[in-house]
Amino acid sequence: MSKKEININNYNDDAIQVLEGLDAVRKRPGMYIGSTDGAGLHHLVWEIVDNAVDEALSGFGDRIDVTINKDGSLTVQDHGRGMPTGMHAMGIPTVEVIFTILHAGGKFGQGGYKTSGGLHGVGSSVVNALSSWLEVEITRDGAVYKQRFENGGKPVTTLKKIGTAPKSKTGTKVTFMPDATIFSTTDFKYNTISERLNESAFLLKNVTLSLTDKRTNEAIEFHYENGVQDFVSYLNEDKEILTPVLYFEGEDNGFQVEVALQYNDGFSDNILSFVNNVRTKDGGTHETGLKSAITKVMNDYARKTGLLKEKDKNLEGSDYREGLAAVLSILVPEEHLQFEGQTKDKLGSPLARPVVDGIVADKLTFFLMENGELASNLIRKAIKARDAREAARKARDESRNGKKNKKDKGLLSGKLTPAQSKNPAKNELYLVEGDSAGGSAKQGRDRKFQAILPLRGKVVNTAKAKMADILKNEEINTMIYTIGAGVGADFSIEDANYDKIIIMTDADTDGAHIQTLLLTFFYRYMRPLVEAGHVYIALPPLYKMSKGKGKKEEVAYAWTDGELEELRKQFGKGATLQRYKGLGEMNADQLWETTMNPETRTLIRVTIEDLARAERRVNVLMGDKVEPRRKWIEDNVKFTLEETTVF
């Protein structure tokens, strides 16, 4: 993809515009970074990295280095033009404006970026506000400058020249220490950062991104010569491949478009879309353009070649996307950039759809005409997908009609114990392993808003099965009907009967397996539930410690071995320890107190921070290939003596 060159002289102090002050960032950090947990902590990293990415995206710098330092701080070094070092119109150094004024950045003037995801200043000031200290070092115009901020963004030094450098050497280095009084954790995760940098490297063809962890001496570099083509190969790494990677690129109205496509033998699609290197997880007009182009071109080809007869209806888009892995990356000029809502999760720029549609349609049409046998195989695969879809819809409709004809008291063959409330915004559905635990849960629940659905039979592995076979599985079918929002392409989150879907299983390998099967189903066929944060895992205690009898009995619970050791010290000698092997060992009161009471329970919310990472993880753990799964288990699972039986 061609890059729009921007004159280095135009990126100066006048290019930084100020929109508003930095007030309230420390008071309401969630408004700026989403949360103050681990996700919010790493959002600070993304803000600074995105600034460096923008420089590389605009053609300045071919390397970005991230370092987790021994003291827990983090450094991002780019080799771009270097932030402006002169005085701003406000009467203070421009660097100080960038790091202390909210929404001061290069995006808003004409001399900064033509396309941009993050911006020097826009995120920098937020990172500074939420750090106990921050240092910025700038190499530019043959000199090296440095400034330090402390206590949430207050400058403690002015911008000083601290040395010289060759005029050819430029860049910005930012080091910051997150404020432990704001974040629940300040522990940067090597794997989380490395996977995000890997994704960015795919989108920045021939730019090297590195991560070094000085705490553990781990280090890794990412560099991809083929960009999004390599990205698609990465997504399909553990799958059976049906086609080579198809790559299309083009430019129209200032929009630059790159698309890579490849088909595998799976039954679901995986489309990742990006705007100015920022992931648009909810898609948008650019993704709509891609999908419409594929559907239109494939149907036209099927008609011309006679694979679809006159009497046949056109295939649906979902038929052509079965088994498709695709990466769409577009660069949108600032004057056309428009997102829906406050986040950058969905592109709203109207012009993006016809631009992407036109480029992809032209290139895909040519490819199909040049590769007739492969094209025909893809059409036949889509026809099979249509047949499976129609069979699945018929089975689903029959299932729904059969359930609706039953009396309320016989609902779901007596499986579901419904909540009294009819308010979906408050109701919770517990998916409980086994009848015995289901019985305790029914007795212990708050019947006003908690519904119980025991899972008695085997849950099918939905990563391997066709939709028609999935709907034959009684447990899956019951869940679909209970949740009430459809499944797959027909899923509508607005119709869901519950605000929280809570998976509650035993704390053993069987329980973990059931969790994995259920999460795979939700990920594949009810993904909006997961993306919107409606799926949870209950966390029952592992231990119960008691001492005394009758009214004098003391009881406490431990969820980890560390908590157990604390209880041992607290209770001293004479205490009784019970290790829970299953939910059924707890009576109704204990289950309510430890696992179901909103005031005292602990729930794990299931989220998708990185879709590419999630897709690969599901493929490895639930797919057909044994060797990648064995390797992942060997690398990531520690087997202890507690899990080993010695005879």
UniProtKB/Swiss-Prot annotation:
Which residue ranges are recorded for the region named Disordered?
Answer: 391-421
| Superkingdom to which the source organism belongs | Bacteria
Q: Where does Mg(2+) 2 bind?
A: 506, 508
Q: How is its activity regulated?
A: Inhibited by quinolones, such as levofloxacin.
As recorded in UniProt, its EC number(s) are: 5.6.2.2
Q: Please give an example of a GO cellular component term from this record.
A: chromosome
Please give one Pfam family short name: HATPase_c
| Signal peptide start-end | none
All residue ranges annotated as the Toprim domain in the record:
427-541
Catalytic activity as recorded in UniProt: ATP-dependent breakage, passage and rejoining of double-stranded DNA
Q: Which residues bind ATP?
A: 11, 51, 78, 118-124, 344
Which sequence ranges form a coiled-coil region, renumbered to this chain? none
Q: Look at the named UniProt entry and state the broad enzyme category this protein falls under.
A: isomerase
How the cofactor binds, per note?
Binds two Mg(2+) per subunit. The magnesium ions form salt bridges with both the protein and the DNA. Can also accept other divalent metal cations, such as Mn(2+) or Ca(2+).
Q: Which SUPFAM superfamilies match?
A: ATPase domain of HSP90 chaperone/DNA topoisomerase II/histidine kinase (SSF55874), Ribosomal protein S5 domain 2-like (SSF54211), Type II DNA topoisomerase (SSF56719)
- Composition bias (Basic and acidic residues) maps to 391-401
One GO molecular function term of this record is:
metal ion binding
Protein name, entry field: DNA topoisomerase 4 subunit B
According to its UniProt entry, this protein's organism is: Streptococcus pneumoniae serotype 4 (strain ATCC BAA-334 / TIGR4)
